[in-house]
């Protein structure tokens, strides 16, 4: 029998490799060697380190759109580690959006892709990031196991 749980942790970005796929207007801005189109989309290959009750690493492939104002993002992440003492791996589907100030996303656990103690886990996490932080970002996961 499954029970509802809520747990939390923090994550930091350990690598970010972003490349433009489409620059609609040919107008981009370069920041720290990365090009960001005014309108278009890119792919970012990213790794995260998690700590707290969610501990481990994540490898993410993002598709990020750029548009003045609201712009959607999506991606898939393979998480390996421990959630509330359950060791294994699972896959999150990231669905979100961003603007000039904030990134918002819901991370859905993809059913059927878990291993070990995380096999059979269902649920979702939410994140809202305002600006860059070297100290990491909070994540709260609601799950059933």
Task: State each model region's role.
Residues 2-145:
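Beta-strand-enriched cores of mature, soluble protein domains
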């Amino acid at each position: 029998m499954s029970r509802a749980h809520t747990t939390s942790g923090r994550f930091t970005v350990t690598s970010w490799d972003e490349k433009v796929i489409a620059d609609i207007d040919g107008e981009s801005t370069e920041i720290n060697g990365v090009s960001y189109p005014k309108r278009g989309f890119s792919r970012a290959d990213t790794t995260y380190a998690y700590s707290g009750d969610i501990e481990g690493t994540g490898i993410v492939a993002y598709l990020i759109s750029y548009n003045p104002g609201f712009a959607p993002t999506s991606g898939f992440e393979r998480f390996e580690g421990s959630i509330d003492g359950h060791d294994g791996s699972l896959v999150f589907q990231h669905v979100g959006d961003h603007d000039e100030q904030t990134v918002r996303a819901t991370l859905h656990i993809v059913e059927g892709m878990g291993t070990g103690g995380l096999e059979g886990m269902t649920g979702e996490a939410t994140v809202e990031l305002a600006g860059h932080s070297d100290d990491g970002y909070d994540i709260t996961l609601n799950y059933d196991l």
